[in-house]
From Swiss-Prot:
This is Phosphoribosylformylglycinamidine synthase subunit PurL. One of its GO terms (molecular function) is phosphoribosylformylglycinamidine synthase activity. One of its GO terms (biological process) is 'de novo' IMP biosynthetic process. The gene is purL. It comes from the Bacteria.
């Protein structure tokens, strides 16, 4: 494409060509006012990506301000590539979650793969070595051929990238619901480790310092990816396949090692990933954060395609690229390091003091824009908010307990629901043991990695039950944070902080904006009560397909610290004779449950309630008991209720069973009341455990007969099943659905 084909400034305005880039009439008028002139094609392209929701958070900034972002351990909150939390001994953990939803709907393999690559770069751009990847995935019903295709390709893309780069994929979640039929969610989280003195920022400081481009060459892939991520999916979205990037994990591995070596060199001033909006966002953001400007000569940009225009180079989202700022005169030191890895490192510009992004191409100035206008001064919209009509109706609807004729069959049926069923088919494709630090592999409440050279370990998880958020976004937001914390606690860790991925529909619809506001209120309250500040994250809006929105899905990524590896706990029962306890009472709460979805085919009613103070006291008591060595296993009660949680606890390599007595009718086994745990304890610790965890109720014991037996207080048998049979249906459900041609 040659420059001659680009429309003139006048054409852009008169024909409203800017609208095709997602810029509104009001925004164009504001741009004209800021510049005091009409923007050219490259400039309006740059504004369009920087002012997209994906880059500017223009619709969500008022919401994000609600989150608590500071704490005594927080070293870096929102605003950089990733958040950082102190874990003692001069070490810190770096983590962030990001979405790649729209690209994954079109090109599921590359969309998912580049989502993993992008979040890994965010973490190592802070100076940290990535140690783990997690993912949170949502798809439509697994009976649909298209959903099967998306599911298989997304998992293959995550595995293909993560396995090749040598970072273990240690956890995550997959849920299936019809609301994600046309718009799957692919959220990737990366966790890294760093020493305090190695922390780097994405800032272009020091007038005259050199701006260097490192990594892969620039192509035409991913142009307008950020804009594409800021609009609804529709039947015409297939035409935007070129907005999907293509990843090369082997290049990323080299880039990772080279960047970590460069970080040890004091010639490095600033470093940032070329993520969404590529060269545009990295240059404008680095300059704006430092109060400086950047001038670049685009003729010097390494290109893998011929005849690329300034517009294409600045908006490309080609992968595996970083922008560095280096002390002037020390460029060769950096070039030599990248040479070792057979990577390009090219000086393409310098830092200025005029707060402008100035670009030259073929001897002409093709862009001259104020960096603050691009990075910080995008318009912020306070969208109208309106409670949906269904909300009041749900709030006043108490869902009666379903009549269950055969609890045995109901348990088996629930264990085969794809959201509950074993995800072994997924994580068997991931290398979760590479680098040999993984202590708790996928399949328990949280992934756990040891920190070499110390007694410490890190627990990590992602969580969100979007059905609860659909019923009541504020309550659902609280539950999402609380469940993530429960998973961390069950692993023997103290929750440290949160990274959140806010996946919602179109914020221009008042009912959707209401969901976002209320969910943020719930998340904020839970983070305050549980002392887990939000240190960064991502907003993904416009998750709609042909006008239908996904369920509100604010995914919570959480990391916890295990002070001593002796405290590491998993969900599985350990030996016959151990006592089984449930912590927390079970109420008849079936709205939004897996049981309701399976038996009625729809979700309605009043969401399960949560008392955050009670939640906190139970979590603290359980963690105290774990640290004192009283607890053999711990598992949080979530989808499918107590029946499913106990069944999952008996599925071990040993042929264990459990004999349990509970109060109430069979349906209560599948209620999804909150703030509950299933715990096993050695008999000799019974008194000490009960004194520590006052809410714990002794309900039975672990047996050696391989049978799960559950009866009510009258001795009436509700469940009597071989644990190996339960495990067979649980593990076989997803492979069986994928093989069927339905």
């Amino acid at each position: 494409m040659s420059l001659l084909l680009e429309p003139s400034k006048e054409q852009i305005k008169e024909e409203k060509l800017y609208q095709q880039m997602g810029v509104s009439d009001d925004e164009f008028a504001l741009i004209e006012s800021i510049l005091g002139r009409l923007p050219n094609y490259t400039e309006i392209g740059i504004f369009s990506v920087m002012w997209s929701e994906h880059c500017s958070y223009k619709n969500s900034k008022p919401i994000l301000r609600k989150f608590p972002t500071s704490g005594e351990r927080v070293l870096q909150g929102p605003g950089e590539g990733a958040g950082i939390v102190d874990i003692g001994d001069n070490q810190a953990v770096v983590f962030k979650i990001e979405s790649h939803n729209h690209p994954s709907a079109l090109e599921p393999y590359q969309g998912a793969a580049t989502g993993v690559g992008g979040i890994i770069r965010d973490v190592f751009s802070m100076g940290a070595r990535p140690i783990a990847v997690l993912n949170s995935l949502r798809f439509g019903e697994l009976t649909s051929p298209r959903v099967k295709y998306l599911f298989e390709e997304v998992v293959a893309g995550i595995a293909g990238y993560g396995n090749c780069i040598g970072i273990p994929t240690v956890g995550g979640e997959v849920q299936f619901d019809s609301s994600y039929e046309g718009n799957p969610l692919v959220n990737a989280m990366c966790v890294g480790l760093i020493n305090h003195e190695d922390i780097k920022k994405g800032q272009a400081k020091g007038v005259g310092n050199t701006v260097m481009y490192v990594g892969a060459k620039t192509g035409r892939d991913g142009i307008h990816g950020a804009t594409f991520a800021s609009e609804e999916m529709s039947d015409s979205s297939e035409e935007k396949r070129s907005a999907v990037q293509v990843g090369d994990p082997f290049m990323e591995k080299l880039l990772l090692e080279a960047c970590l070596e460069v970080i040890q060199c004091d010639a490095l001033v600033g470093i940032q990933d070329m993520g969404a909006a590529g060269l545009t966002s990295s240059s404008a953001e680095m300059a704006s954060k430092a109060g400086s400007g950047i001038e670049m000569n685009l003729d010097l940009i390494p290109q893998r395609e011929t005849g690329m225009t300034a517009y294409e180079m600045m908006l490309s989202e080609s992968q595996e690229r970083m922008l560095l700022v280096i002390e002037r005169g020390r460029e060769q030191e950096i070039i030599d390091i990248f040479d070792k890895y057979d990577l390009e490192a090219v000086s393409v510009g310098h830092v200025t003091d005029d707060k402008m992004l100035r670009l030259t191409h073929k001897g002409e100035v093709v862009c001259e824009l104020p960096v603050d206008a691009l990075a910080e001064e995008a318009p912020v919209y306070h969208k109208p908010s309106q409670e949906p009509a269904y909300y009041r109706e749900f709030l006043e609807t108490d869902v009666p307990a379903p009549q269950i004729e055969d609890a045995n069959e109901m348990l088996k049926a629930l264990l085969q629901q794809p959201t509950i069923a074993s995800k072994e088919w997924v994580y068997d494709q991931y290398d979760y043991m590479v680098r040999t630090n993984t202590v708790v592999a996928p399949g328990s409440d949280a992934g756990v990695l040891r920190i070499r050279g110390t007694k410490k370990a890190l627990a990590m998880t992602t969580d969100c039950n979007a059905r609860y958020l659909y019923l009541d976004p504020e309550v659902g937001g609280k539950i999402a944070v609380a469940e993530a914390a429960r998973n961390i606690i069950c692993s023997g860790a103290e929750p440290l902080a949160v990274t959140d991925n806010l996946n919602f529909g179109n914020p221009e619809k008042p009912e959707i904006f209401w969901q976002i506001e209320k969910a943020a209120d719930g998340i904020s309250e839970a983070c305050n009560v549980l002392s887990t500040p939000v240190i960064g994250g991502n907003v993904s809006l416009y998750n709609e397909s042909n006008g239908t929105a996904i369920y509100p899905t604010p995914v919570i990524g959480m990391v916890g610290l295990i002070e001593d590896t002796a405290h590491i706990t998993t969900q599985h029962f350990k030996q016959a004779g151990d006592l089984v306890y449930v912590i927390g009472e079970t109420k008849p709460e079936f709205a939004g449950s897996e049981l309701q979805k399976m038996t009625e085919g729809r979700i309605y009613g009043k969401a399960p309630q949560i008392d955050l103070d009670v939640e906190l006291s139970r979590q603290k008591a359980l963690l105290d008991a774990i640290k004192k060595g009283f607890v053999q296993s711990a598992h949080d009660v979530s989808e499918g209720g107590l029946g499913v949680a106990i069944a999952e606890s008996v599925m071990t390599t040993e042929n264990l069973g459990a004999n349990v007595t509970v109060e109430g009718e069979a349906a209560l086994l599948f209620s999804e009341s909150q703030s509950r745990f299933v715990v096993s304890v050695k008999k000799e610790h019974q008194a000490a455990f009960e004194a520590t965890v006052k809410d714990a109720v002794h309900i039975g014991e672990v047996t050696a007969d391989g049978i799960l037996a559950i009866q009510n207080q009258d001795g009436q048998q509700m469940i009597h099943a071989q644990t190996k049979e339960l495990e067979r249906v649980w593990k076989g459900a997803i492979p069986c659905l994928l093989k069927s041609k339905a």
